[in-house]
């Protein structure tokens, strides 16, 4: 079985531990914040935290959905922490970030699916951090474009929403979300003309190259200009197993194909994640 195959050398990483890593950890924990770095068991956490960067996760640490690739806790979330937007903004200031990335759990339990909390967070980041550029990685808000408009009007510099996987695998990989709803969200962002629309996908779940290229074409047709492609890694036994480890050479091939197809920016390598080197995606 694929899950018993030894992890290849190119996926073995050194966990960070310098002074900047410790400082970042202290700031995050001191403000009682959540990051996708820890909840998602991101392989780049050592590198990013050692550079003083982190991807903040708002809305709490419990998601209302149960996507089979994701390690974030799922269940009934706690009430929103109204101080969270300010805590995130202050942490960005303390870290001295020039570019910040914020994502969230899905909050399908709320009437607005968390959109108002998103807007408050963006506004607080802008108020406290003059000159900082901001990327937001948003949920699909169940296809409610009026809620997507709230995020657009708050004016982050980049709005990202991940397709995650190819059309065929979406029902077995993602929870509640659909491929076409995600495309519609991306199209709506791009059509606003106010900021780049960005998406990301994982490889190694059993997709074919033909399906990957179809996703690229669908994303481009929706107006997406930035795409990230990385290797899926099984975060725990309850998650989907890895079907295949994609080689660095295959990732580079896809990067070149994506450039030829017309993406303005494409990151494609085994350890690439949506927010990895996000400052390049403005």
Curated annotation (Swiss-Prot):
Named cofactor requirement(s): [4Fe-4S] cluster
What class does this enzyme belong to in the EC scheme? transferase
Q: Where is the Radical SAM core domain?
A: 49-264
Tell me which residues bind [4Fe-4S] cluster 2: 63, 67, 70
Tell me the compartments it is located in.
Answer: Cytoplasm
Pathway entry:
Protein modification; protein lipoylation via endogenous pathway; protein N(6)-(lipoyl)lysine from octanoyl-[acyl-carrier-protein]: step 2/2
Cofactor annotation remark: Binds 2 [4Fe-4S] clusters per subunit. One cluster is coordinated with 3 cysteines and an exchangeable S-adenosyl-L-methionine.
Entries under InterPro entries matching the protein: Aldolase_TIM, Elp3/MiaA/NifB-like_rSAM, Lipoyl_synth, rSAM
A Pfam cross-reference name: Radical_SAM
Stretches of the chain forming a coiled coil according to its record: none
Question: EC number(s) in its UniProt entry?
Answer: 2.8.1.8
Write the record's keywords in alphabetical order, separated by commas.
4Fe-4S, Cytoplasm, Iron, Iron-sulfur, Metal-binding, S-adenosyl-L-methionine, Transferase
Record's Gene Ontology CC terms? cytoplasm
Q: Which SUPFAM superfamilies match?
A: Radical SAM enzymes
Q: Which SMART domains match?
A: Elp3 (SM00729)
Molecular function (Gene Ontology), one example: 4 iron, 4 sulfur cluster binding
The entry's [4Fe-4S] cluster 1-binding residues are: 37, 42, 48, 275
Gene3D superfamilies assigned to the protein according to its UniProt record, in alphabetical order: Aldolase class I (3.20.20.70)
Catalytic activity, as annotated: [[Fe-S] cluster scaffold protein carrying a second [4Fe-4S](2+) cluster] + N(6)-octanoyl-L-lysyl-[protein] + 2 oxidized [2Fe-2S]-[ferredoxin] + 2 S-adenosyl-L-methionine + 4 H(+) = [[Fe-S] cluster scaffold protein] + N(6)-[(R)-dihydrolipoyl]-L-lysyl-[protein] + 4 Fe(3+) + 2 hydrogen sulfide + 2 5'-deoxyadenosine + 2 L-methionine + 2 reduced [2Fe-2S]-[ferredoxin]
Regarding protein family, the annotation reads: Belongs to the radical SAM superfamily. Lipoyl synthase family.
| NCBIfam families referenced in this protein's UniProt entry, alphabetically | lipA (TIGR00510), PRK05481.1 (NF004019), PRK12928.1 (NF009544)
Please give the name of this protein: Lipoyl synthase
User: Which source organism does the UniProt entry give?
Assistant: Porphyromonas gingivalis (strain ATCC 33277 / DSM 20709 / CIP 103683 / JCM 12257 / NCTC 11834 / 2561)
Chain's gene name: lipA
